Swiss-Prot record:
Gene3D superfamilies, alphabetized: NagB/RpiA/CoA transferase-like
Miscellaneous information on this protein: Present in outer membrane vesicle formulations which are used as vaccines in human.
Family, as annotated: Belongs to the LutC/YkgG family.
Ranges annotated as spanning the membrane: none
Domain of life: Bacteria
Listed name of the protein: Uncharacterized protein NMB1437
Amino acid sequence: MSARENILAKLKKADALPMEEPAVFDYYREMGVSWGSEVERLKHWAAAMRAVKTEIYWVTKSNWMQVFREAAEGKGLKNILLPLATEHGQIARAALADSNIEPIAFEREIDTWKTEFFTNIDAGFSGAQCGIARTGTLMLFSSPEEPRTLSLVPPVHFCLFDTSKMYNEFHNAVEGEKLVENGMPTNVFLISGPSKTADIQLTLAYGAHGPRDLVILAILPDHISPADLEENA
C-alpha cells in the first residue's frame, strides 16, 4: 500500500461527525438593517439608485401609464419593445396609443431579427419582481414572456416596480419570494442602476454593457404620497 493509499484508508476509517448547519437566516434577521417607516426605507432605496444615475418616478396604479408615456416622449424615443404576453405590457401599449412612439412586441426568436434588435430598438419595458432597500436594487426574473435581453440590449430600460414588494435586504427577498421553497427561476438578476464601467484611468462610462438609462416607474401604495418622498430623497 502506497503512502497515499494508507492516508486515504485512515481517513475513510475515521469517525465522521456531521457538522451542524449554520443558522444563516437567523443571523441575518438579527444583524440586518431596518428603517423607522416605509417612507424612510423608500428614501434610502431611491437615494442609492439615484446615486448611480437611475431615474425614478413616483407613480400610482392609476397614473403610471401617463407618466410612462410622458417620460418616453421626453426621451424622443421612436419605438419601445414591450412584453405583450404580460398584463403590464398590454397596458403600456395602450398608454402609447396615438403617440409618435411605435410599440413593438417581443415575440420573435432573437436569431430571426438580431441585427434589427441590436441597432434599431430604442428602449425596452419590463416589470420588476421586487426591490431591495439596503443596496438600492431591483430583482427581476427572466421568463419566456420577459427574457433578459428585453432589459439588457436596448439603450433605455423602463421598469415598472410595485413598491409594496420592497424588502430590507437580499435575504429578506429570498425568504419573501420563497426562492428556496419554490425553486429558482432559470435567471434572476439584480439591477442597481444603468450599465456602467470604468477603465484603468477611472473614466466612468454608461451604457457599455447594457442600457445607458434606467427609468423606474415606482408604484406607491395609497397611504404614501410622492411629496413625502421627494424631501431629501
